[in-house]
Amino acid sequence: MTFQGAFTALVTPFKDGEIDQDAYRELIEWQIEQGIDGLVPCGTTGEAATMTHEEQGEVIRICVEQAKGRVPVIAGAGSNNTKEAVNLTKLAKQAGADATLQITPYYNKPTPAGLLAHFKALSEEASMPFILYNVPGRTGLNALPETIAMIANEVPDVVGVKEATANLGQVSDVIEQCPEGFTVLSGDDFTVLPLLALGGHGVISVVSNIVPDLMSGMCAAYRAGDMKKAQELHFKMQPLNRVMFVETNPIPVKTALGMMGKFETSFRLPLVPLMEASKAKLEAQLKASGLI
């Protein structure tokens, strides 16, 4: 299976502290109706760090069930504990996910040899396609292009990378050094179009939670050779991208979906509601963009 185009890093609706299954299914259905190319449950945006393993398995299962094979599902299943990552990956595999998103182990800052050993263990104990997730702003570790290329060459289950550095020089080096057919997805909504121009394949997106049609449309326009339309959609999304990060993700995007009437805005600690000043900025931009 190839992974290209716009994948939404899905938020997880909560109600009374529990997963709101009905709202989650409705969000997934709306995403598919709006033309999204794929779904990513249990990532950073999905507040997976606040869930039990059982809850993560449930969220992935619901996503796979609701998608019904219409779009691929890449399930977040990473950890800084290799054994835990193996167990989460097995849960995702049992739930029917097409691949998993594997964050580079955070906090303990493994060496390149440690990263390779981590992904080899994952492949040996829970074999399925993996997308490596490089997000140094959250992990404290930047997997350099030569490290990603080493892992890609030595661990065949690692089929791609979500590059969230927003460093186009680094993205270019990853594309240059990794094997042919290795998928490179943006983890930064601001630089999706230039990443595509370098030879990347798509994005795992935050803003597509609220505008799946625009993000998938931009990726499709680029693939069709319509650069003018792709540029128009890029600039149409940029103001929304800015307010999506006015505070820590996923607080703004989840608040936006609440303003759009998709579900009740609720977070699990340590995340708290958007500050009033930020909420005013978000509301103004959603109105300016015609979303509310």
Curated annotation (Swiss-Prot):
Leading EC class: lyase
Entry keyword set: Amino-acid biosynthesis, Cytoplasm, Diaminopimelate biosynthesis, Lyase, Lysine biosynthesis, Schiff base
UniProt-annotated site: Part of a proton relay during catalysis, residues: 44, 107
The reaction(s) this protein catalyses: L-aspartate 4-semialdehyde + pyruvate = (2S,4S)-4-hydroxy-2,3,4,5-tetrahydrodipicolinate + H2O + H(+)
CDD domains to which the protein is assigned, alphabetical: DHDPS
Family matches, as PROSITE patterns: DHDPS_1
InterPro entries xref list: Aldolase_TIM (IPR013785), DapA (IPR005263), DapA-like (IPR002220), Schiff_base-form_aldolases_CS (IPR020624)
GO cellular component, as recorded: cytosol
Residues bound to pyruvate: 45, 204
Record-level Gene Ontology MF annotations: 4-hydroxy-tetrahydrodipicolinate synthase activity
HAMAP family per record: DapA
Known function: Catalyzes the condensation of (S)-aspartate-beta-semialdehyde [(S)-ASA] and pyruvate to 4-hydroxy-tetrahydrodipicolinate (HTPA).
Name the UniProt record assigns to this protein: 4-hydroxy-tetrahydrodipicolinate synthase
Protein species of origin: Maridesulfovibrio salexigens (strain ATCC 14822 / DSM 2638 / NCIMB 8403 / VKM B-1763) (Desulfovibrio salexigens)
Name of the gene: dapA
